[in-house]
């Protein structure tokens, strides 16, 4: 008796990575279906699958059924509103990590339920493995493309049904495969922008998303380290920790944004040295590779996507108003620990988990 093929749904964006992932799974013998998640459509959308004319290759071997799922309303509520509210709270959001959890994986698993699929797959550059009774997440082998930082919110339920075919490949290898598979997206350029922010201009996006915002917040005070007013800003939501450009102040030394006060509409500045800290508190912790720790533990952590993983001690603090919290103590000072961004914890190449940065703690003065 012929063994039934496992059915897998691949999230298709129209780009080269997801298309190559789908073709690799076809070659590996899976029954492959494509799912294109529509997130920027008008109206409320629906969660009913609809057939799509999308094709990924001119070769009949890779002609797979493709469906669409309109998640526009959910995307507005879960991602776009979050993005807007974080900036209004003087925080710097990371919409991609939220989208992966609440839109991509949730949508793919909903599609899998409707189509009777066993697994879901994406074109992310990361790896999974089942070791010692736990589904684990690892960095992609291509360090320039590794996307494990954006996947720290995933839980055992999602990882147990996830295939990441590109995790062991480099981007040039993926391009070569795309050409060999006859993919229409083989030479397509990558987009580095947030999909709903035209030209990556988040300031203009906020002004359109919050009518009257500019008039309401422009003209607030810019303060130097002593609290003296040295200028007026364009509106606190348009600044982020570590920013230097756009302050419009003339001082003897370069000044950087060190803190933002949304209630007082104030932007605090200081020298570059004021951006450094060795400790930060994080909330909304999610653990993947280990059970939640109850005692201090050693790891490494990234505080932004392109950051290098720095040695640290994770100190659990227990429940707080923003969820379970921990304090991260770095061995060496880190610059611009920005509220709203993610701190993602690693042990070697394995992602242990992560949390949302709530704020840096002042450095202890040298005796």
Swiss-Prot record:
Chain segments annotated as transmembrane: none
Matching Gene3D superfamilies: Adenine nucleotide alpha hydrolases-like domains, HUPs, Translation factors
Interaction with tRNA as annotated region, ranges: 145-147, 304-305
Family: Belongs to the MnmA/TRMU family.
EC number: 2.8.1.13
Main location, first listed in the record: cytoplasm
Entries under Pfam families matching the protein: tRNA_Me_trans, tRNA_Me_trans_C, tRNA_Me_trans_M
Superkingdom per UniProt: Bacteria
Catalytic residues (positions): 99, 195
Disulphide bridges, residue numbers: 99-195
Localisation per UniProt entry: Cytoplasm
InterPro entries, alphabetized: MnmA-like (IPR004506), MnmA-like_C (IPR046885), MnmA-like_central (IPR046884), MnmA-like_central_sf (IPR023382), Rossmann-like_a/b/a_fold (IPR014729)
Function text: Catalyzes the 2-thiolation of uridine at the wobble position (U34) of tRNA, leading to the formation of s(2)U34.
GO biological process: tRNA wobble position uridine thiolation
Keywords: ATP-binding, Cytoplasm, Disulfide bond, Nucleotide-binding, RNA-binding, Transferase, tRNA processing, tRNA-binding
Residues that bind ATP: 11-18, 37, 123
HAMAP family to which the protein is assigned, alphabetical: tRNA_thiouridyl_MnmA
Site note Interaction with tRNA, residues: 124, 341
GO cellular component: cytoplasm
Molecular function in Gene Ontology: ATP binding; tRNA binding; tRNA-uridine 2-sulfurtransferase activity
Protein name from the UniProt record: tRNA-specific 2-thiouridylase MnmA
């Amino acid at each position: 008796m012929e063994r039934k093929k496992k059915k897998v749904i691949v999230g298709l964006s129209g780009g080269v990575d997801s298309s190559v992932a789908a073709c690799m799974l076809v070659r590996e013998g899976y029954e492959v279906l494509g799912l294109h998640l529509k997130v920027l459509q008008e109206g409320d959308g629906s969660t009913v699958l609809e057939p799509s004319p999308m094709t990924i290759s001119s070769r009949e071997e890779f002609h797979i059924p493709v469906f669409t799922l309109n998640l526009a309303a959910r995307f507005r509520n879960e991602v776009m509103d979050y993005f807007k509210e974080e900036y209004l709270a003087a925080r710097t959001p990371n919409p991609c990590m939220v989208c992966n959890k609440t839109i991509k994986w949730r949508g793919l698993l909903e599609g899998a339920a409707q189509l009777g699929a066993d697994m879901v797959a994406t074109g992310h550059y990361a790896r999974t493995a089942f070791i010692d009774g736990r589904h684990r997440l690892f960095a992609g082998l291509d360090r320039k493309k590794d996307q494990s930082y954006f996947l720290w919110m995933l839980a055992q339920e999602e990882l147990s049904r996830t295939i990441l075919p590109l995790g062991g490949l480099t981007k040039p290898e993926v391009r070569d495969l795309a050409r060999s598979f006859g993919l229409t997206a083989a030479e397509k350029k990558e987009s580095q922008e947030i999909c709903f922010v035209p030209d990556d201009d988040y300031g203009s996006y906020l002004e359109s998303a919050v009518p009257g915002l500019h008039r309401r917040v422009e003209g607030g005070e810019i303060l130097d380290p002593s609290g003296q007013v040295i200028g007026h800003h364009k509106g606190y939501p348009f600044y982020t920790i570590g920013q230097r450009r756009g302050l419009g102040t003339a001082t003897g030394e370069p000044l950087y944004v060190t803190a933002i006060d949304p209630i007082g509409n104030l932007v605090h500045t200081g020298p570059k040295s004021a951006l450094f800290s060795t400790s930060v508190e994080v909330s909304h912790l999610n653990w993947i590779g280990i059970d939640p720790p109850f005692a201090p533990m050693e790891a490494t952590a990234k505080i932004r996507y392109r950051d290098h993983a720095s040695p640290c001690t994770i100190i659990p603090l227990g429940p707080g108003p923003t969820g379970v919290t921990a304090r991260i103590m770095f061995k060496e000072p880190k610059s611009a620990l920005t509220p709203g961004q993610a701190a993602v914890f690693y042990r070697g190449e394995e992602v242990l988990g992560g949390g949302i940065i709530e704020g840096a703690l002042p450095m202890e003065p040298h005796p």
